[in-house]
Structure formats: C-alpha cells, structure tokens
C-alpha cells in the first residue's frame, strides 16, 4: 500500500495499535515499518485500526487465534521440561491472548521517512532493529528467508538465526525470566540491516494478563529470589 494509505491508520499517543514507521529501540529509530493488532474483545468491540480490506482483517484474526493456541501449547511443554513433569502446568501462570499482540514487520532497504521527516525524528540506529528483550512470556516468530535475525550468546556472542522453512522461532521474554528466577533468561536479540531485499517477519507476543503478578516461583526455580514482586500492568507501562 502507499504511504498515504498506511498512515491513515497510524499509531498515536492514545491509540497504540495500527501502522507505525518510526519505532524506537533504546531511543534510536529502527529501520522498519510495523502494523500491530490485538484480538477483538469478546463483546465484539474492536480497538484495532484496520486497512480497507475485510479479507485482511479476517485472515489476521484467524492467524491470531492459531498463534494463541500454539503459544499455549508451547508454554505447557516448556513447563513440563522445567519441572520434569512434577507439576501440572495448569497450576502455573499462563499467558493471556487478551493482552497479547501480533506485529507485522517490514524491513525496507531504505528509510521510509522523507528527508524532511528525518530531521524531526531520532536518527536511525546501527541495526535495523536494536538489541532488546521482549517483555512478555514468550514470542513466536515467523520470518521469511532474508535473514538478519541474531540472538546473543554469552559463549559465542551474536549468533545468526538462520531462516528455516516451516519453522517458528521461540524467544523467552522477561516474564519467564522473572518466574524462573533467572534460570531461563529472556532472549536478547536484534536484526541486522538488509541490503539485497526487504525482510518480512511476524511475531506473536504472548503476554501475561493485565492483573498478573510477576515474581520468582518456587515451582520453577531454586535459591533466593533475585526479583521483587511487581505487576505486569505496571511493568509494561514503564516499557512503553
């Protein structure tokens, strides 16, 4: 779609969903365009901003529902591995599709902002997407064959996550790091700039419920707690 069409559904300070082309990571602008949406509420209230395409909306909602199912199954398997089948995963904290989001990422070859717009926004960072961890429970990522995604390893430094057809990359988030008391760390990752062709990726961010409390859980870790208790609602507000 044209820039004009995309900016009709531009994110604002009061509307965090929709299109955006000046995302910041650690105060540096990322070289990407995004479209964020959530599942419409049970009362059919839709807080999303959608482009003028009914079929697009329908496909995205089906994708969201399928991603929620995969995320729930992935978390259950992760809990089984951590607790070695000693605890029913139903007794452990869950993610909540009502607070989760899908993002469509587009990494262009050049800056999507005009020269004039570039003068009034933060400068581009060295990466297409600066290094960061995701705040939630876990992230499911679909990526095309372009490459560029890297994750940080204490042993090997930055490691390329090579695209593999039909695969889903799973990143653990900050919530899981807290629940496991640092036994499992949130994945520090970034995206390198693309040079030959644009890159597309689609993450599903599986987040705790709004009223969820984040604290180390004895069922998932040993030793003294390294985090104090705090609410997800407060944490995500501080991250924005």
Give the role of each language-model region:
Residues 1-240:
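Peripheral, non-catalytic segments flanking oxidoreductase cores
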């Amino acid at each position: 779609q044209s820039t004009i069409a995309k900016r009709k559904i531009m994110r604002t300070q009061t509307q965090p969903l929709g299109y955006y082309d000046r995302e910041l990571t650690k105060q540096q602008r990322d070289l990407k365009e995004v479209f964020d949406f959530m599942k419409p509420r049970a009362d059919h209230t839709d807080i999303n901003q959608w482009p003028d395409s009914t079929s697009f909306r329908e496909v995205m909602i089906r994708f969201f529902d399928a991603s929620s199912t995969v995320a729930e199954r992935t978390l259950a398997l992760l809990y089984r591995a951590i607790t070695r089948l000693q605890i029913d995963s139903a007794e452990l904290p869950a993610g909540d599709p009502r607070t989760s989001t899908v993002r469509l990422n587009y990494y262009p070859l050049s800056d999507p902002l005009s020269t004039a717009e570039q003068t009034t926004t933060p400068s581009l960072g060295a990466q297409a997407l600066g290094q960061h961890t995701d705040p939630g429970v876990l992230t499911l990522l679909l990526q095309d064959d372009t490459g560029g995604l890297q994750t940080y390893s204490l042993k090997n430094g930055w490691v390329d996550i090579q695209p593999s057809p039909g695969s889903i990359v799973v990143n653990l988030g900050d919530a899981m790091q807290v629940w496991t008391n640092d036994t499992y760390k949130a994945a520090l990752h970034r995206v390198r700039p693309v040079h030959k062709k644009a890159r597309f990726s689609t993450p599903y961010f599986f987040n705790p419920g709004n009223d969820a409390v984040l604290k180390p859980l004895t069922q998932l870790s040993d030793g003294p707690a390294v985090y104090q208790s705090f609410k997800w609602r407060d944490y995500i507000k501080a991250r924005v």
